């Protein structure tokens, strides 16, 4: 098992776990309703050099040369720049949106998405991806990690608590309530 920075060649391997992680948000960020259009839009976003879902913000976990899981992380203070790229792409396709709702606070190294393909679940891959992201965040000088977990996902909430994340607020995002959780990494 290795964890590494994603590359453009990973585009086909990251789509399934990314869409699984985004769940109901997949249509909001893509501006699409049909599954094949959603997949095409996230492939397009992934191949960009900038943007929230650019390959530059992904780490992948490989098992036997297959992508077993992904984590998407970026600095929260960079999100306006990252989102402007995505918003321009959406506007080109007639989806007019000025901004996305805010899902984090200032000065956080934010875990946007985390998912493990079903064939690889139960092997501790999600934990390893999170630990890897925390290490990278610390190396880059960030002091705090953050993530959101849906209010109904008690199992995930419990796992994050065991990893040292603490709920500091609740955020309503597109009509759904999420726990905002943070962990100091300095």
Feature-to-residue mapping (PLM):
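Conserved GNAT acetyl-CoA-binding A-motif
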Residues: 107-109, 121, 130, 137-148
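C-terminal "cap" of GNAT-fold acetyltransferases
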Residues: 91, 107, 142-164, 170-186
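Conserved GNAT-fold acetyl-CoA-binding loop/helix
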Residues: 23-46, 57, 90-92
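Conserved beta-strand in the GNAT
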Residues: 60, 66-75, 110, 115
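A short helix-loop-beta-strand connector motif used in the catalytic cores of GNAT acetyltransferases and
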Residues: 47-60, 77-81, 110
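A short beta-loop-alpha structural element at the N-terminal edge
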Residues: 2-16, 24-28
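Conserved acyl-donor/pantetheine-binding loop and adjacent beta-alpha core of acyl/acetyltransferases
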Residues: 75-109
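A short, internal acetyl-CoA/4′-phosphopantetheine-binding micro-motif in the GNAT/acyltransferase core
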Residues: 62, 89-90, 94-96, 114-121, ...
